Curated annotation (Swiss-Prot):
Keywords: Cytoplasm, Kelch repeat, Nucleus, Phosphoprotein, Repeat, Signal transduction inhibitor, Ubl conjugation pathway. This is Kelch repeat and BTB domain-containing protein 7. InterPro entries: BACK, BTB-kelch_protein, BTB/POZ_dom, KBTB_W-LIR, KBTBD6_7_BACK, KBTBD6_7_BTB_POZ, Kelch-typ_b-propeller, Kelch_1. As part of the CUL3(KBTBD6/7) E3 ubiquitin ligase complex functions as a substrate adapter for the RAC1 guanine exchange factor (GEF) TIAM1, mediating its 'Lys-48' ubiquitination and proteasomal degradation. By controlling this ubiquitination, regulates RAC1 signal transduction and downstream biological processes including the organization of the cytoskeleton, cell migration and cell proliferation. Ubiquitination of TIAM1 requires the membrane-associated protein GABARAP which may restrict locally the activity of the complex. One of its GO terms (biological process) is regulation of Rac protein signal transduction. It is found in: Cytoplasm; Nucleus. A motif (ATG8 interaction motif (AIM)) lies at residues 668-671. SUPFAM superfamilies: Kelch motif (SSF117281), POZ domain (SSF54695). Residues 63-138 form the BTB domain. The ATG8 interaction motif (AIM) mediates interaction with proteins of the ATG8 family including GABARAP. The BTB domain is required for interaction with CUL3. Residues 10-26 have a biased composition (Basic residues).
Length: 684
């Protein structure tokens, strides 16, 4: 052992006091951290205590206050009585805490009378105070919201708002908007407005006396909706039509507001094709009486004097001063509504680290869509995904082998994570049918056991359940929807699921040695099986038939078929070179029974060669350009493959690059798209 003098200078401690070592500070030993009495916690104590208090409440034991809930219009002594514990109510409910501890008159009374809440809602809320659980339904949710808002029960109030938001539909969206406005709930109001904007075209056609429509909105509510940029419409005429509908629903009372309402119409986006419609608009009595000058001024600014005079042969000279005011708003040139730029596009899903590509095969436009899987790419906890699209153009993505499920909202260009699935799987597929997401097939990622369980997710309730299992396990298969039935098909068998009876039925099998891809087109199932064989199944007749073979190329690496805007497309890619692959798109001619190369403009695609595709309606104005994923062929040939391997990709790319991330047999298994012909029709 070295002495102090023998220690090298570099290892000796420096001292500001002439080389003297600093005093050693006395610190407690390890045992000091474990002295004193041991503190233990009974993790079941709070739940057991609450359960016991609830049993006292049910048995009316040790209760110290009686709450009488009186129906509005009734006198004292006619209400329903609730025997409760002050401390429980005060601890759980801010309203009762103020009542019983704030020196109010009721704090000293054995009985308290309440008038502004109904007995049924109060019973549910008292149960919540004792249990932390609340039962919501369409019948009680609005009354519970009002009662919880009064009693300041924040959790119940927000649960009611979430319940209403998840049940928005065409028949109740305007009523929920009015409800949110009445209670000034900003989030619910925004969600209702977003739903109305997304379904504005359908709502503009509704006029049943049994349903609340856009005509039932107040002036302020209507103006807020008509001013939205996010209206999913193809023409500004739809906005004008709704404005007229609203005014004519109560012409006498609403007529004076006509000018303000029509200023929400973006006249600059009318075209010459709208001339007949505008001529009819100018002849409507409510327009001629209240706002002819406003509309004339806007049209003159939009079309100029020549076309304006053809629309309005004899301008109203007395309205020239007021029409000049409307020119200001027309000259602002507001943007197009969101729906005017909507397009059905082919979406490419590839490696988890990459964004998704949105491609129009006829115009060559390409954009990128964000991926929710990016954060998992480097951890390798997500190897692939399964995707499907709903009739409302929402894209659902299930990660593999994790339990995550996301939904993509095109108007917001964002992903929302939903409730976790019940099982981890790999090699599964997913489909959307009538408000439910179905997941089946694949195997357990740990044991490798093939799974027969079928998971079902309720979009409305954000909940999962297990439904009837498949009688045979599925791997290397496709899950597709035709009409109101679910079909699982592979090379050996095809099963049909009837959700109305929760049962699986056997169908005529494909009887092929290989299975590649399937999609729905014209209510029939098109399958690529033993390449280049294409077979078609007609569910109505229960028969298979063979059509023209798909184009065969020895260098083709990947085959995808999609239903794009009521056209059946075959998308192929070549074996990757320089980490890039050439993509070719063919359209099927049903009359001539042949595949036609439509002349894709993609060039060489720098993307995962094991991509899968589906079609969905998206909004290019919300997306980012995707040209960086395309390389001209001449540029690719000039690159050195050695330089590309060294400089173009990271270590992660070399380990799990697109050309080797999936085997040939697993490309279509691990990431399986859902293409529902009926769903695509809903996007037109």
């Amino acid at each position: 052992m070295q002495s102090r003098e023998d220690v090298p200078r570099s290892r000796r401690l420096a001292s500001p006091r002439g080389g003297r070592r600093p005093k050693r500070i006395s610190k407690p030993s390890v045992s000091a951290f474990f002295t004193g009495p041991e503190e233990l916690k009974d993790t079941a104590h709070s739940a057991a205590l609450l359960a016991q208090l609830k049993s006292f409440y049910d048995a009316r034991l040790l209760c110290d206050v009686t709450i009488e809930v009186v129906t509005p219009g009734s006198g004292p002594g006619t209400g329903r009585l609730f025997s409760c514990n002050r401390n429980v109510l005060a601890a759980a409910c801010p309203y009762f805490k103020s009542m019983f501890t704030g020196g109010m008159y009721e704090s000293q009374q054995a009985s308290v009378t309440m008038h502004d809440v109904d007995a049924e809602s109060f019973e549910v809320l008292v149960d919540y105070c004792y249990t932390g659980r609340v039962s919501l339904s369409e019948a009680n949710v609005q009354r519970l919201y009002a009662a919880s808002d009064m009693l300041q029960l924040e959790y119940v109030r927000e649960a009611c708002a979430s319940f209403l938001a998840r049940r928005l539909d065409l028949t109740n969206c305007t009523a929920i908007l009015k409800f949110a406005d009445a209670f000034d709930h900003h989030k619910l109001r925004s969600q209702a407005q977003s739903y109305i904007a997304h379904n504005f075209k359908q709502l503009s056609r509704m006029g049943s006396i049994r349903e609340e429509t856009l005509a039932d909105l107040t002036l302020a509510q209507l103006l807020a909706v008509l001013r939205l940029d996010s209206l999913d419409i193809e023409s500004e005429r739809t906005v004008c039509h709704v404005a007229v509908q609203w005014l004519e629903a109560a012409a006498k009372e609403r007529g004076p507001s006509a000018a303000e309402v029509f200023k929400c119409v973006r006249w600059m986006h009318f075209t010459e094709e709208d001339q007949d419609y505008l001529e009819g608009l100018l002849t409507k009595p409510i327009v001629k009486k209240y706002c002819l000058d406003v509309i004339e001024g806007a049209l003159q600014m939009r079309y100029g004097d020549l076309l304006y005079k053809s629309l309005v042969p004899v301008p109203n000279s007395s309205s020239s001063s007021s029409s000049s005011n409307s020119l200001v708003s027309a000259a602002e040139n507001p943007p197009q509504r969101l729906g005017m730029c909507a397009k059905e596009m082919v979406i490419f899903f590839g490696h988890p680290r990459d964004p998704f590509l949105c491609y129009d095969p006829y115009s060559g436009d390409i954009y990128t869509m964000p991926s929710p899987l990016t954060s998992f790419a480097h951890t390798k906890t997500v190897t692939s995904s399964a995707v499907c699209v709903s009739p409302d153009h929402d894209i659902y993505l299930a990660a593999q082998p994790r339990k995550d499920l996301w939904v993509y909202k095109p108007a917001q260009n964002s992903w929302q994570q939903l409730a976790d699935r019940l099982l981890c799987r790999e090699g599964m597929d997913v489909a959307y049918l009538n408000g439910y997401i179905y997941i089946l097939g694949g195997r357990d990622p740990i044991t490798g056991v093939k799974l027969k369980e079928v998971e079902c997710y309720s979009v409305q309730r954000n909940q999962w359940a297990l439904v009837a299992p498949v009688p045979h396990s599925f791997y290397s298969f496709e899950l597709i929807v035709v009409q109101n039935y679910l079909y699982a098909v592979n090379s050996k068998r095809m099963l049909c699921y009837d959700p109305s009876h929760n049962m699986w039925l056997n169908c005529a099998s494909l009887k092929r040695s290989d299975f590649q891809e399937a999609c729905v087109f014209n209510d029939e199932i098109y399958c690529i099986c033993d390449i280049p064989v294409m077979k078609v199944y007609n569910p109505a007749r229960g028969e298979w038939r063979r059509i023209s073979n798909i184009p065969l190329d020895s260098e083709t690496h990947n085959y995808q078929i999609v239903n794009h805007d009521q056209k059946l497309l075959l998308i192929t890619s070549t074996t990757p070179q320089w980490k890039k692959n050439r993509v070719t798109v063919y359209e099927y001619d049903t009359r001539e029974d042949q595949w036609i190369n439509i002349g894709t403009m993609l060039g060489l695609l720098q993307f995962d060669s094991g991509f899968i595709c589906l079609c969905a309606r998206v909004y290019p104005s919300c997306l980012e350009p995707g040209q960086s994923f395309i390389t001209e062929e001449d540029d690719a040939r000039s690159e050195s493959s050695t330089e590309w391997d060294l400089d173009g990709f990271s270590e992660l790319d070399s380990e799990s690059g697109s050309s080797s991330s999936f085997s040939d047999d697993e490309v279509w298994v691990q990431v399986a798209p859902q293409r529902n012909a009926q769903d695509q029709q809903g996007s037109l």
